[in-house]
Structure formats: structure tokens, C-alpha cells
């Protein structure tokens, strides 16, 4: 009887470790995906500058880009900050943003966001990427905009030339 109690206790104690290892593997997979999907190429405070800021990854860009005829867009904060990032978004809302281009309020993301390239991501990879984004240290960083074509822009930006 004593052996059964010891085995049962050991099994119960190992469950949190197994869950922790699975969660770590999920976040690690998500970090890999964020890297190959080049999320930091835009959603970084040093994006579009000679010196990217790697201390606050994916906390949004302070340099925007203009899409002629559409406006100026600043890549937003993807950290789990509740005020300026994705902290109030559900897993489903985050996944809909990068697979369907939909914001929680129903508006579409800027066309420069390559969500169509990510629309066929597997459900497991979508959850991994979301787990990684949620694992980041929250950074309060309110990026400017977006700005319509006739609005005054309050930050530096690049102009994109669309193919003809």
C-alpha cells in the first residue's frame, strides 16, 4: 500500500513539471515562428532604423510607413501590455489578426501586415505564436496613428512605393 501511495504522489508531482515543459516547448516554437515570420522586422521600437532595439522585442515601431492613398501606419505593440499591447485580446482575437487580418473591433489591419501569408498556419503553430507573444514582458509603448491620407502625422515615417 505504501508503494502505491509513493507512486501516486510521484505521478501527481510530475504533472506540473510535464505541463511546464509543454508550455516551454510551445513558447519556444512560437519564438521560432516569430523569428522566421520576421515579426520584429516591423513590430520593434527600432524598426526601420539603423539600430533595432532588441531589449523590448515586438513592442511596436515609433517609425511608421505611408501607403499612398491609404495613410500612415505604425506597427503596433505586440507585447501583453494591457494598455498599449495585446494584453486584453483573447487567443482567438490574436490568431484572427495574423491569419485573417481582423482586429477585435472588426476593422481590417493595414495591408502591409502580411496576414495572407500566415493564413494557412496550422492551429498548433497559431497557438504557439500566441503563447510566445503572451510570454513577452509587457511593455507600455503607445505607437502613433494610424493616420488617414489627409491627417497630420505625428511621427517619422517612410513612404512605400506600390508596384505598378
In which residue ranges do the predicted regions lie?
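Bacterial N-terminal signal peptides that target proteins for export
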Residues: 1-8
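Short functional linear motifs
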Residues: 6, 27, 91, 123-126
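C-terminal segment of classical bacterial N-terminal signal peptides
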Residues: 13-21
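Cleaved targeting-peptide boundary
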Residues: 22-32
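Flexible coil segments in periplasmic/lumen-exposed cytochrome c-class electron-transfer proteins
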Residues: 25, 35-36, 44-73, 104-164
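Short, cysteine/histidine-rich loop/knuckle motifs that typically chelate Zn2+
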Residues: 41
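Mid-chain, structured segments of secreted extracytoplasmic proteins
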Residues: 66-96
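A structural feature that tracks compact, well-ordered secondary-structure segments
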Residues: 83-89, 96-102, 115-118, 130-131
Amino acid at each position: 500500500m505504501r508503494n502505491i501511495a509513493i507512486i501516486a504522489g510521484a505521478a501527481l508531482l510530475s504533472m506540473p513539471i510535464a505541463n511546464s515543459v509543454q508550455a516551454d516547448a510551445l513558447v519556444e516554437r512560437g519564438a521560432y515562428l516569430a523569428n522566421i515570420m520576421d515579426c520584429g522586422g516591423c513590430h520593434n521600437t527600432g524598426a526601420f532604423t539603423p539600430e533595432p532595439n532588441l531589449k523590448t522585442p515586438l513592442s511596436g515601431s515609433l517609425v511608421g510607413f505611408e501607403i499612398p492613398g491609404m495613410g500612415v501606419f505604425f506597427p503596433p505593440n505586440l507585447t501583453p501590455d494591457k494598455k498599449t499591447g495585446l494584453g486584453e485580446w483573447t487567443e482567438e482575437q490574436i490568431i484572427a489578426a495574423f491569419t485573417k487580418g481582423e482586429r477585435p473591433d472588426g476593422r481590417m489591419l493595414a495591408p502591409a501586415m502580411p496576414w495572407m501569408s500566415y493564413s494557412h498556419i496550422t492551429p498548433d503553430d497559431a497557438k504557439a505564436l500566441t503563447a510566445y507573444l503572451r510570454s513577452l514582458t509587457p511593455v507600455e509603448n503607445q505607437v502613433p496613428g494610424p493616420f488617414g491620407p489627409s491627417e497630420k502625422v505625428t511621427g517619422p515615417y517612410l513612404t512605400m512605393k506600390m508596384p505598378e
